[in-house]
Amino acid sequence: MPTSAIFICARLDEPAHRLLKSTLPTGSITFARHPVISPENLASFQQCDICFGNVPATWLEPPPILRWMQLESIGFEYYQDLREVPSGLTITNLKGLFASPAAESAIAGLLALYRGVDKLVSAQASARWMSLEVRPQMQLLRDKQVVILGHGSIGRKLRLFFETFGCRVQSFARTAEGAELRSADALDHAIGTADIVACCLPKTSETCGLVDRRRIRSMRPSAIFVNTGRGAVVDEIALIECLQQEKIGGAVLDVTWQEPLPPDHPLWTCDRTILLQHTGGGYQDELLDKTRTFLANFARFQKGQPLDNIINLAKGY
């Protein structure tokens, strides 16, 4: 296969940069200058047939000569207004790469609330000993009843972790195999009886607002809401009201409607709320592993083999 022209605008560190330069064909790579949105970068992008990174959606209209774009993310809602992938273009994402770190962060946030770590860290700042006050309030994950919305890579990994802790888990998905909950009625009943409601859903036309005011208010007073999916899935105003009025037991939020949150946002001051600030998928070798994923797919592309993790714009995953 002829040498491909490759445009790279993904966020890289030095090890990832070196790996790309040592692996890809010499003379085939153009690294974007930052900021990415510039006439120079657009001109380079328009001459490439492979892109690694998330370019503005407007760059795909009119359709470029691009044949394959490897996103540096799982989510791709910013491309869904395209309605369809330009003819001849395949888009892949990083499905599965963030499953373990995102699930670990969710568990860490839950344990912080259940084991009183949030209160103890706050007390440490003022040198206050709270052992006798905190200890009787500590809870275990063991035997907790959990509902997971979404049965993709993050949802499945989170389920595995919950089951390892001895939780009783049910998953909600309309089509994915292995999920026990399929209907809206089944989901409503499960949310109303759960100790933990964990959302791992992408943003699609079907999921936006799925966790609405009625469902949030139906949660038990001790229940904790977890979101590692997308902020748009949740009625955030209703969630904040329930947290402020102590109608639910707390929240662990990796994602929010607005990112970054402005300093005056009410979530900052909600009690028993852990804000992970969209760090859930992060880990030390994240950028290197993103690059390895791209290079593995590049090898398939060069051989004419099917690529991993081809997205469906219409479905949103």
Name each region found by the language model.
Residues 1-92, 192, 212:
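An N-terminal-biased, well-structured beta-alpha scaffold segment characteristic
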Residues 164-180:
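NAD(P)-binding Rossmann-fold cofactor-contacting core
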Residues 95, 139-163:
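Glycine-rich adenosine-cofactor-binding loop
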Residues 109, 261, 270-292:
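Adenosine-phosphate binding glycine-rich loop
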Residues 287-317:
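NAD(P)-dependent dehydrogenase/reductase Rossmann-like domain
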Residues 87-145:
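Phosphate-binding beta-alpha-beta segment of Rossmann-like dinucleotide-binding domains, i.e.
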Residues 175-266:
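Rossmann-like adenosine-cofactor binding region
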Residues 72, 90-97, 173, 278:
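Short beta->alpha connector loops at strand-helix junctions that form conserved
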